[in-house]
A protein has these predicted regions:
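Small-residue-enriched hydrophobic alpha-helices in membranes
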Residues: 1-39, 46-143
């Protein structure tokens, strides 16, 4: 049943939020995993995206975080969206944001916290998307 529908998910999302409301980093990782599950059939469908957006709101995550995660999981993510920066930002600011994201999303950090392998695998994918976006921005700006 759970594989076929998202009915009743709000209750579970609230329970997760209550368990980790003071650890937004974990809530972001959980939402990241849910994005991975949603795209497991190759594309994130509109109803799945709606579900993920509701979960994000229940988790009290900001819109920027949601957009970044979505951009990282789209097959053609905008590199600026992935990093949560604007194309008009100067390169030093973009690089600062990239370094902070690498630090916050590095798998070794999760390993040190004893996180499950699923979190670590997702962190590897996320870090690859972050690094790829930064490289694409460097190439676009011929740096």
């Amino acid at each position: 049943m759970a594989k076929e529908t998202t009915d009743g998910y709000e209750l579970y999302a609230r329970q997760i939020y209550n368990a980790f409301k003071n650890e937004s980093e974990i809530l972001v990782k959980i939402l990241d995993l849910l994005f991975e599950i949603a795209k497991s059939d190759g594309i994130i469908k509109s109803e799945e995206l709606n579900y993920l957006e509701v979960v994000s709101k229940i988790f009290n995550l900001d819109e920027k975080t949601f957009r970044q995660l979505f951009a990282q999981h789209k097959s053609e993510g905008n590199p600026y969206e992935i990093l949560g920066v604007k194309s008009t930002d100067d390169f030093e600011e973009i690089q600062r944001v990239w370094k902070q994201m690498v630090k916050n999303n590095h798998p070794d950090k999760l390993i040190g916290k004893g996180m499950p392998i699923e979190f670590i695998n997702t962190a590897n994918h996320r870090l690859a998307a972050i690094n790829s976006a930064f490289e694409e921005i460097k190439n676009l700006n011929k740096l």
